[in-house]
Amino acid sequence: MADFEQVITDSQKFFNGDDLAASVFATKYALCDKAGNYYETSPDDMHRRLSKEFYRIESNYPNPMSENEIYELLKGFKYIVPQGSPMSGIGNTHQIQSISNCFVIESPHDSYGGICKTDQELVQIAKRRGGVGFDISSIRPKGLS
C-alpha cells in the first residue's frame, strides 16, 4: 500500500515531471480503497492491473494472448490508451462502477412528464461522470400542437 504523496512522486517520474498528469492519475485512476490506501503508484501499475484482468477473460478463449503480451500493448500508453472509466474500473475490486463512458437512453416521450423522466435519467448518468446520448426527434417542433 502507498499514500497519496507516493503516488504523486511515482507518477511524476512516469510522466517525466508533468505535475498535472501525475495529479490526474492519482486522483482519478490509481487504484485506491475507501480508506485512502493506494494499491497503484503509477500508470505502469495500472497497466499491470488491466493486463491481468484482460488476461482473465482472454484465457476463456482459444489462443489467448498472455498477460505479458497484453501488458506490452498497454505499457507506456504506446499502442492502446484506455479512457476514463475503463482505466479506473477494470480489475478494481475496491469499488463497483461502470466501465462505460457513454450511454444511450430512450428518446423522450413528447410530453412534459416524458421530458422530465429523460432529464432525470440524464442527470443520474452525468453525476456518475457518464456521457449521455438520446434522439430528440420524437419531440414536436416549436409551434406545433
Locations of regions flagged by a protein language model:
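Extended catalytic cores of very large enzyme megasubunits
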Residues: 1-145
